[in-house]
Amino acid sequence: MSNYHIKHLEEYYQVYRKSVREPENFWEEIAEEHFVWRKKWDTVLNWDFLKPEVKWFEGAQLNITENCIDRHLTTRGDKTAILFEPNNPDEEAQHISYKELYKKVNKFANVLKQEGIKKGDRVCIYLPMIPELAISVLACARIGAIHSVVFAGFSAAALATRINDSECKMVITADGSFRGAKTIDLKGIVDEALKSCSCVKTVLVAKRIMTDINMTDGLDKWLAPLLYNASDECAAEIMDAEDPLFILYTSGSTGMPKGMVHTTAGYMVYTAYTFKNAFQYKENDVYWCTADIGWITGHSYIVYGPLANGATTVMFEGVPSYPDYGRFWDIVQKHKVNQFYTAPTAIRALAKQGSDLIDNYNLSSLKVLGSVGEPINEEAWHWYNDNIGKKKSPIIDTWWQTETGGIMITPIPYVTPTKPTYATLPFIGIQPCLMDENNNELKGNQVEGRLCIKYPWPSIARTIWGNHKRYKETYFSAFENKYFTGDGALRDEVGYYRITGRVDDVIIVSGHNLGTAPIEDAINEHPAVAESAIVGFPHDIKGSALYGYITLKGVGESRDQDNVRKEINQLITDRIGPIAKLDKIQFTSGLPKTRSGKIMRRILRKIACNETNQLGDTSTLLNPEVVKEIIDNALLK
């Protein structure tokens, strides 16, 4: 029996039992047999959730790019590593082999070194989904620089916050990006961000849209000529197991985004192992994750996980609706995609178009369908199963987080019987538990509580960059000696897990975690706004959308309310990005508050969801009369 590739349910239970009874022996075996090390570890695991501190494979030395590229050169050198599908279907796809990837990454790594980037330096990457994005990530890892990828839909203000927090010395960007029918001025956004960033010494600019842009002497450099002149050989920097690999920012329920730090060895082992099993990846399969590398899904399951397994990974620059809603299926047919991993928000948008369009495409290559970003609702699950999988391709509803680094709870296709809306069973080595509000573990089945993890896994984020205190407070203070996920979950009669949603002030919109505090901060900058509260409400496509309750100052009450709404959404776009715009804005004379002055978001959430019969006792509020006003004027269409 190979612990590395699980093929049936009995084997899953055997391997799972071993992984939780002897976790150190289990992960040592996986690490030893399936990866390349410059030096083996002294200890497999040191951990203490009270500090909190987690260290895997301490004493080991390696470079993750040797595991993702170099070791494949003799056996898979000519195999396609990255298959790039451009935004415009008339533009030819690019097949980058492992040999070519090796040369491209080395050239890029040499450019970074030439520009003064050293091991431990932070590099911000603000690029569209073009090959340079994956290559620059790997080039940083090649020389031991810490990459910080920022999704290229974030605003200049959001980009500047992230650059400053990790003190990036370099930004890698492009002249612009294509997104469906739109062209986005990425370089202009970087220029705006850098007005408030003194740490950046160099900006490397890739050409994508080929338009004239502003280039600042001494700061901005075109990437192409530097790559052309660089050597295609670059020795990999030897890294310690616990050296940081990357920082990735995720929304917090309070203002500042959290720079999650992932380290080298444990992250590599866990993402590779989860990729192999969660997608039942086999040699010569073509795998496609539709996420952006700006999110953790793209880091783990477009770049590192697939390449560590010598896979062919598809990178798609565009959107599912351009030039029409058949684009995903056109790509599946064209490249004979075997594993397809997308978000419920995309599935719902495609389902809305009906199934006639799908009949034009041959989807018979599909073996596994994946879902990520939020729990998939039942209607979308059945549509995906019936129309895309033709009831033959299992759906893996994967639950995990930026903080976890890799998939945590998921069915294994052709192994775990699936159940709509359920993430089903914990992945190998993962020990989930459900807790009540009094810090008691809920044992047995048919229970619901707060989802925690009892024992460390190799790819857990080690800290928040520059703020270990916040890391402890956020993840390890709610429940003693356990990692708290921030999610609620239930365990059914057979032990399957279903994620019931966030229990903090984070709303998942189109699969993206949005903290309410930063959005409210942006709104409250408007001169006409006195106070605001943001809640989520169900949305057919996005899963959740944002509903804003806003009280105006005297100056705002006399203004045209539609104009104020537009200005508020523009402020949000400028501060955070268009992803955080409000779908509904209701102006109200006040917000319901406790006598201590706390806004009762629970009540506002119920009103936004049209559940006003479940408000409970509002008589203890400081201002109960405002609840009736809000209900009477609620925007429920």
Predicted feature locations:
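Conserved AMP-binding/adenylation subdomain of ANL enzymes
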Residues: 268-286, 296-339, 352-353
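AMP-binding/adenylate-forming catalytic domain of the ANL superfamily
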Residues: 202-207, 541, 574-599, 613-637
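Conserved AMP-binding/adenylate-forming core of the ANL superfamily
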Residues: 65, 82-138, 155-160, 215-224, ...
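AMP-binding/adenylate-forming catalytic core of the ANL superfamily
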Residues: 150-176, 190, 333, 340, ...
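Conserved ATP/PPi-binding loop(s) of AMP-dependent carboxylate-activating enzymes
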Residues: 425-429, 440-475, 514-516, 611-613
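Conserved pre-ATP/AMP-binding loop-to-beta segment of ANL
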Residues: 78-80, 204-205, 216-249, 256, ...
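Gly/Ser/Thr-rich phosphate-binding loop
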Residues: 304, 308-311, 338-342, 351-420, ...
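ANL superfamily adenylate-forming
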Residues: 89-90, 170-241, 353-354
